[in-house]
Amino acid sequence: MGILIEKVNTERFSMDFFRFGTGEKTVVILPGLSVQSVMGAAEAIAAAYQSLAERYKIYVFDRRSNLPEAYSVQDMARDTAEAFQTLGLRDVCLFGASQGGMIALVLAIEHPELVGRMVLGSSSAHVREEQYRVIEEWIRLAKAKDREGLYLSFGREIYPPSVFKQYRETLIAAAGTVTDRDLQRFVILAEGTKGFDIVSELDKIQCPVLAIGVFEDSVLDSDATMEIAEKLDNRPDFRLYLYTGYGHAAFDTAPDYRQRILAFFEQGSGEMRSEP
């Protein structure tokens, strides 16, 4: 599969992204918070989304290259919108995972012309004090330059125990490649979630939405997805699905996750129900 790794340059910043796929329509993926840049996982992501690549051109965006000292989720969204506009992307099928879902929400609210359909994965319309505790611990580990501790805490919180056990040694090995710059970027991006709250603006979203959550989300809590549903479930174009047993990173661990995304982008109809 051909993967093109590129950079979009605006007057204010540059942003790395990669793209793959041969379809006519466009899917954009906004990944969640990660210890290292998503660009290093381009091949793995392209392989995971191969079923969508046969029908779509898929863009995966990193955050901007040079981060300011303070960088809120709203700032991330506005920069991502500018990157979209520079590349001529509009009316896209948008998938945002975790923090990427927060960015997607702001995009859909502030730039409805850019988003045609939206899937939110393990995300939230707010980050309150109790939700910030896990992120705050990651920030502490990153500031202490405890690379292994950070990667292990990250894996322990986002994966179910069986998956964490399976990947523990891989996470330890990955920690050895983390640079000081990676840690600095991580802290800025993680701190940017503090105080995020757009619950009162959710009714401004104009596009169809599928919210996918997890009952055992130990990062943002399963209630976060349900709260989005409470604001949008009176709309005929809103769908909700909740997993059991796959952890916060169900977008990586649930075997049928990408098929659900594809079905929503392709049809946008039919009842979506939670697993028993």
Language model features with spans:
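Conserved HGGG/HGGXW glycine-rich cap/lid loop of the alpha/beta-hydrolase fold
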Residues: 9-67
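Short alpha-helix in the alpha/beta-hydrolase fold that links the catalytic acid
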Residues: 42, 207, 221-230
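Conserved acidic catalytic loop of the alpha/beta-hydrolase fold
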Residues: 75-92
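Flexible "cap/lid" loop of the alpha/beta hydrolase fold
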Residues: 105, 109, 116-145
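Conserved alpha/beta-hydrolase catalytic His-Asp/Glu region
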Residues: 129-131, 149-196, 201
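Short beta-strand/loop motif that positions the catalytic acidic residue
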Residues: 205, 211-213
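Acidic catalytic loop of the alpha/beta-hydrolase fold
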Residues: 216-220
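Catalytic histidine-centered segment of alpha/beta-hydrolase-like enzymes
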Residues: 246-256
